[in-house]
């Protein structure tokens, strides 16, 4: 089952996005509907709201007066936090009940207005944010919903900022044009990314790195930050650390030539043992990262290095074993390397990035090697890796010489 999260500020067009995905075949779990359900007359939720905000948030018949509640709950951060503290846990429990009853082959669309504010974004393999600027949203609320302008602005101000939403957005859909334009963008997203993602996940099938080198893209760092947060949430205490590694972790440095890389995000999860790595297989699959069992380790080095004494200068090839997962999302190819803390391959994954960042000459040399390898490989990733290996073997020695000279440690 693929569960995606969608969100957007009030008046941005989230309801239209949700209904479009529903028409495409998605099973929509609407956070607004659940939020209303858990505060119906006679519920614990409504009783708690009355205790917190007073009897005057009720209509004469005993139902919740949502406008009266909004006036009180959105007046400041403290009041909003009280509201969220009551409603969010109740909605989460009801959501879990609904999800548990849905077929495993479904694509579940979770429509969550406060996805960012509730800290739930990292629970989803894909987050879609629909956006419109503030003035357009105010106009829609006033003209289409009859909300007073001052209330509209207060509600918008009480929600997450555009920057906070953009930070969690795997997909950013602009809705400043007509409804028809948003519908078409949503349908394109559904059929070209979401459905292929769901299929790949059902088949435990990964997306591999596209052929060719591309110039370093500033968005890689933001994408990796989201992936790291998602994987930390998925792995919990079983991950000792989660890091962005590889060439996409090397930013552009002004005044130096552009670096290049395959358009693939490499992530390293550090664990205490391979047994712990195996325990992460199912959680990572649910997060969108199936395991590729044919990849069992990295190219071993003799007299390997480590800052951990018992692994220092070891020639044991078993210390280069790992587990390997990759993303099923065609929109963001990602490799996930799970390595054991202190083992030579885990340490070199981190050292190599720091060495590249600190040495412009090394970056230039490595780029030349990658360009040659890319040309010789003609799109074959195995040949590409093999062509780089002689340089990387020497780079292993040079990187550790740099580590020794600079006092590099984890």
Curated annotation (Swiss-Prot):
Molecular function terms, GO-annotated: ATP binding; dephospho-CoA kinase activity
Alphabetical keyword list: ATP-binding, Coenzyme A biosynthesis, Cytoplasm, Kinase, Nucleotide-binding, Transferase
InterPro entries: Depp_CoAkinase (IPR001977), GrpB/CoaE (IPR007344), NT_sf (IPR043519), P-loop_NTPase (IPR027417)
Membrane-spanning intervals of the chain: none
Major localization listed first in the record, in broad terms: cytoplasm
UniProt family annotation: In the N-terminal section; belongs to the CoaE family.
Function: Catalyzes the phosphorylation of the 3'-hydroxyl group of dephosphocoenzyme A to form coenzyme A.
Protein name stated in the entry: Dephospho-CoA kinase
């Amino acid at each position: 089952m693929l569960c995606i999260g969608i969100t957007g500020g009030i008046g941005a067009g989230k309801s239209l996005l949700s209904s479009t995905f529903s028409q495409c075949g998605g099973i929509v779990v609407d956070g607004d509907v659940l939020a209303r359900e858990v505060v119906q007359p006679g519920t614990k939720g409504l009783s708690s709201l009355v205790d917190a905000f007073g009897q005057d948030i009720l209509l004469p018949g005993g139902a919740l007066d949502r406008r009266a509640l909004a006036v009180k709950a959105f007046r400041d951060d403290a009041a909003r936090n009280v509201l969220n503290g009551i409603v969010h846990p109740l909605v989460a429990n009801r959501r879990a009940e609904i999800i548990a009853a849905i077929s495993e082959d479904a694509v579940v669309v979770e429509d969550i207005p406060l996805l960012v504010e509730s800290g739930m974004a990292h629970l989803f393999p894909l987050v879609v944010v629909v956006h419109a600027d503030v003035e357009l949203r105010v106009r829609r609320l006033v003209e289409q919903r009859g909300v007073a302008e001052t209330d509209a602005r207060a509600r918008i101000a009480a929600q997450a900022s555009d920057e906070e939403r953009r930070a969690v957005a795997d997909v950013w859909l602009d809705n400043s044009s007509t409804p028809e334009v948003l519908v078409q963008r949503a349908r394109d997203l559904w059929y070209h990314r979401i459905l292929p993602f769901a299929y790949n996940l059902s088949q435990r099938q990964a997306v591999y790195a596209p052929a060719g080198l591309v110039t370093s893209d500033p968005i890689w760092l933001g994408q990796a930050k989201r992936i790291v947060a998602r994987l930390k949430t998925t792995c919990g205490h079983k991950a000792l650390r989660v890091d962005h590694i590889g060439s996409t972790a090397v930013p552009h440095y002004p005044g130096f030539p552009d670096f290049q890389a395959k358009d693939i995000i490499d992530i390293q999860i550090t664990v205490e043992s391979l047994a712990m790595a195996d325990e992460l297989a199912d959680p990572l699959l649910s997060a969108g990262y199936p395991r590729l069992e044919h990849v069992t380790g990295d190219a071993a080095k003799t007299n390997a290095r480590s800052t951990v004494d018992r692994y220092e200068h070891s020639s044991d090839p078993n210390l280069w074993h790992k587990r390997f997962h990759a993303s099923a999302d065609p929109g963001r190819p990602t490799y996930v390397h799970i390595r054991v803390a202190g083992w030579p391959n885990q340490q070199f994954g981190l050292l190599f990035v720091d060495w590249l960042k600190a040495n412009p000459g090394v970056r230039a040399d490595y780029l030349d090697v990658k360009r040659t390898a890319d040309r010789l490989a003609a799109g074959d990733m195995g040949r590409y890796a093999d062509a780089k290996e002689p340089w990387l073997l020497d780079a292993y020695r040079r990187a550790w010489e740099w580590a020794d000279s600079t006092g590099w440690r984890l």
